[in-house]
Amino acid sequence: MSSDKPKAAKAAADLPEDFPRGTQLLFNPLYNRGTGFSAAEREAFGLWGLLPPRVLSMEHHAARILENFYKKPTDLERYVYMIGLEDRNETLFYRILIDNLDTMMPIIYTPTVGQACQQYGHIFRRPRGLFISARDKGRIADLLKNWPNDDIRVIVVTDGERILGLGDQGANGMGIPVGKLSL
């Protein structure tokens, strides 16, 4: 562990000054690794005491997630569980998605995403995507500035109509572009 300390300290020093640390890092799904942070990383990023002391591998995390995934009684509950994981730890989410694509594809996208769209108001956890309505006419440029990332490589758009043959889902159709981007 002590040999990791200089590397982690250097890596932390090379990061931008505004890089999240402490609880901000743990609540950032792009960078959070939960108990996967090494002891040296915990020291460098101000995580000491914020996590259980044992460091667990990505494989251990993935096995635990899959164990809980299979305990969910319905595909919609599996969908909500996986989206919750994506909200906490994107690296682990995509690792599980890639390693278990045949199992995850029908959960993250069709057919389960259709049911997720129909239940969107009941399973909504946090905003995903950018909602633009007719009321935003004339202010779309300002609205686009609210997106938190500058590095945008792909955009998926829907008007919420005819979602998977389910009819007009309106804002509840956001599950379709989010699901497409996940895959």
Task: Give the predicted meaning of each segment.
Residues 3-183:
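Metallocofactor- and cofactor-centric catalytic cores in central/energy metabolism, strongly enriched
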